[in-house]
């Protein structure tokens, strides 16, 4: 459940900005049918930063309800306050989620020791499997391999979503951790190379609109069929790149609407709708990928 193509699911909203349960079910059904390995609910792509705490919990619980055991659900529970991250995590202790994805604290930029103590505190207060999430471009904080290795010694810290795009991190972390510690890419454009170097999958933005293709890509790579995997990845590469043409999840929500996967591409401020120029670029990427 923690390997292969794991989607960082968008949070669909209606025209007034309320959570759209009908579209959420449609998205979940699409991922079940497409072979997505697991769903991350309310991560960065799910607009965690603009949801209230109540909405955050509601979306995770609705995702569990609507998936109805057909696909594992991972809850996004990161925060830049340790007490808040602990509270979010404990909220889902007996919910049915299979684990939590917890991003490094953002804006306050803790030291490596601060990062260690932050994640240790979360793990000590929940039995749920914890996946660390390192994305310095968004957080301003880079969790280095020696810190990851220290955290990997804690029983329920089972892996990391590594989204630096720096492929050398794979071997650097592998040298310091046990073989059962999961390395997951957080960068679609380099995910295939990441897997070839020893990663076990990707937590993917692209999978929101190319779920079947991303599941196939990961399966081919896991089987060692890199020639076919590369051909598929080459077709998807414009999509990997252009879904970040404007700040994510702006382009991917527009793409989900364009493919009929949800009713609107509504976002909440400070996220704004995709520009006309952006829509042309993303539409072309969808066409190049054979999705339109």
Curated annotation (Swiss-Prot):
A GO CC term attached to the entry: cytosol
Spell out the subcellular localization from the entry: Cytoplasm
What's the EC number here? 4.3.3.7
Q: Which GO terms describe its molecular function?
A: 4-hydroxy-tetrahydrodipicolinate synthase activity
Q: Which residues form the active site?
A: 133, 161
**Binding-site list for pyruvate:** 45, 203
* Catalysed conversion reaction: L-aspartate 4-semialdehyde + pyruvate = (2S,4S)-4-hydroxy-2,3,4,5-tetrahydrodipicolinate + H2O + H(+)
Pfam families referenced in this protein's UniProt entry, alphabetically: DHDPS
> Which top EC class is named for this enzyme in its record?
lyase
Q: Which PROSITE patterns match?
A: DHDPS_2
Annotated site, Part of a proton relay during catalysis, chain positions: 44, 107
Q: Which GO terms describe its biological process?
A: diaminopimelate biosynthetic process; lysine biosynthetic process via diaminopimelate
Pathway(s) of this molecule = Amino-acid biosynthesis; L-lysine biosynthesis via DAP pathway; (S)-tetrahydrodipicolinate from L-aspartate: step 3/4
Q: Which SUPFAM superfamilies match?
A: Aldolase
User: Keyword set for this entry?
Assistant: Amino-acid biosynthesis, Cytoplasm, Diaminopimelate biosynthesis, Lyase, Lysine biosynthesis, Schiff base
Query: Which SMART domains does UniProt cross-reference here?
Result: DHDPS
Q: How does it assemble?
A: Homotetramer; dimer of dimers.
User: What family does the database annotate?
Assistant: Belongs to the DapA family.
Q: What does this protein do?
A: Catalyzes the condensation of (S)-aspartate-beta-semialdehyde [(S)-ASA] and pyruvate to 4-hydroxy-tetrahydrodipicolinate (HTPA).
Per its record, how is this protein called by name?
4-hydroxy-tetrahydrodipicolinate synthase
The gene that this protein is the product of is: dapA
